[in-house]
């Protein structure tokens, strides 16, 4: 294809799409399927976890907070903000239960509040594990409960300085003994220097009981 010549501009010649919700519309499903909103009005839903009894946990939150140290950061921040939602971060886990099977949640409760940008979720051996932007924590869970019965217990801290790519993905090994956490890079192309990339762009393998960890993979951007 014919590509335009490179141009240097103070402001990029681009249009940012205005963030809007679905409204009364729904995604178009293949023939024989329908799409129903299980719940609406969530505060920046990120990841979901289906619990053993079919209840659904939703992590709601927004993190980040890389400092604006250069003129470029101020300009880029202004442009990116145009595409951000105005919805406030939930910083919580919301539990949804569809008791009658009609596809709409009949029960909706705040399962756990006052979290720090929760993202990854996993359920292993009676505990719900939550990857916040700065720590891996857990709370005990008994099937059927709609609110956490204890304060989060820290398993291990997670790298969070600057936090350009803040989301922390989480999954468990088949036997449940190891938790894997994805830790994003602190830049796009190393523009902040390599010192801030220490223990970033990696996957950690974390012992579920002791919190001991090792680096499983490196060079993974986000």
Enumerate the predicted regions with their spans.
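Beta-propeller domains with acidic blade repeats across secreted/periplasmic ectodomains
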Residues: 1-222
């Amino acid at each position: 294809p014919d590509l335009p010549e490179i141009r240097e501009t103070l402001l990029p010649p681009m249009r940012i799409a205005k963030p809007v919700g679905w409204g009364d519309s729904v995604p178009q499903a293949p023939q024989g399927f329908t799409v129903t909103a299980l719940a609406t009005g969530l505060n920046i839903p990120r990841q979901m976890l289906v619990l053993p009894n079919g209840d659904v946990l939703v992590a709601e939150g927004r993190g980040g907070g890389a400092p604006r140290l250069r003129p470029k950061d101020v300009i880029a921040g202004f442009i990116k903000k145009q595409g951000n939602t105005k919805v406030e971060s939930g910083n919580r886990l919301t539990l949804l239960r569809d008791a009658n099977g009609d596809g709409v949640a009949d029960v909706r409760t705040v399962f756990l509040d006052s979290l720090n940008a929760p993202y990854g979720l996993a359920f292993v051996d009676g505990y719900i594990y939550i990857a916040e932007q700065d720590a891996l924590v857990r709370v005990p869970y008994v099937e059927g409960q709609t609110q956490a019965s204890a304060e989060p217990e820290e398993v291990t801290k997670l790298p969070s300085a600057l936090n350009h790519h803040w989301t922390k993905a989480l999954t468990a090994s088949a036997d449940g003994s190891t938790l894997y956490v994805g830790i994003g890079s602190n830049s796009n192309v190393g523009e902040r220097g390599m010192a801030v990339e220490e223990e970033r762009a990696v996957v950690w393998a974390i012992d579920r009981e002791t919190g001991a960890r090792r680096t499983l993979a490196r060079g993974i951007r986000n």
